């Protein structure tokens, strides 16, 4: 079992959360941003599988529990201000976004408009 004292070094929001950025461990591509609470970060550190806190559902969210696209955690990093987590992950199935794309950051600002630049790898209707 992991020693949980590392959790005390994090600067949590007033809601008891910390933003967590998941990126591909091999390519460095930013896949998504989600929130973690103490329990989800502790579980992630213990199991090496990404577990987040769903603010909309008010419960733990095991990434990939519905889609099968889990994130196997290779490393957990804390920024210099101790208020942002970065997870280096192996994204199972190559899809992190509920839109069926590799990354949730698939839109790019071009000439003042947001343009979808990354392809849909799988129709979300086939995933969920």
Swiss-Prot record:
Known cofactor(s): Mg(2+); Zn(2+)
InterPro entries recorded: PRA-CH, PRib_AMP_CycHydrolase_dom, PRib_AMP_CycHydrolase_sf
HAMAP family assigned to the protein according to its UniProt record, in alphabetical order: HisI
GO cellular component: cytoplasm
Presence of the UniProt keyword Cytoplasm in the record: yes
Subunit composition and interactions: Homodimer.
Family stated for the protein in its record: Belongs to the PRA-CH family.
Any one Gene Ontology molecular-function term assigned to this protein's record: magnesium ion binding
EC numbers for this chain: 3.5.4.19
Co-factor note (free text): Binds 1 Mg(2+) ion per subunit. Binds 1 zinc ion per subunit.
Source organism of this protein record: Saccharophagus degradans (strain 2-40 / ATCC 43961 / DSM 17024)
Xref: Pfam families: PRA-CH (PF01502)
Subcellular location field: Cytoplasm
Binding locations of Zn(2+): 80, 97, 104
Catalytic activity: 1-(5-phospho-beta-D-ribosyl)-5'-AMP + H2O = 1-(5-phospho-beta-D-ribosyl)-5-[(5-phospho-beta-D-ribosylamino)methylideneamino]imidazole-4-carboxamide
GO biological process, one term: L-histidine biosynthetic process
Binding site for Mg(2+): 79, 81, 83
Function: Catalyzes the hydrolysis of the adenine ring of phosphoribosyl-AMP.
Protein name: Phosphoribosyl-AMP cyclohydrolase
Pathway: Amino-acid biosynthesis; L-histidine biosynthesis; L-histidine from 5-phospho-alpha-D-ribose 1-diphosphate: step 3/9
Principal subcellular localization: cytoplasm
Record's keyword terms, sorted: Amino-acid biosynthesis, Cytoplasm, Histidine biosynthesis, Hydrolase, Magnesium, Metal-binding, Zinc
UniProt cross-references to SUPFAM superfamilies, sorted A to Z: HisI-like (SSF141734)
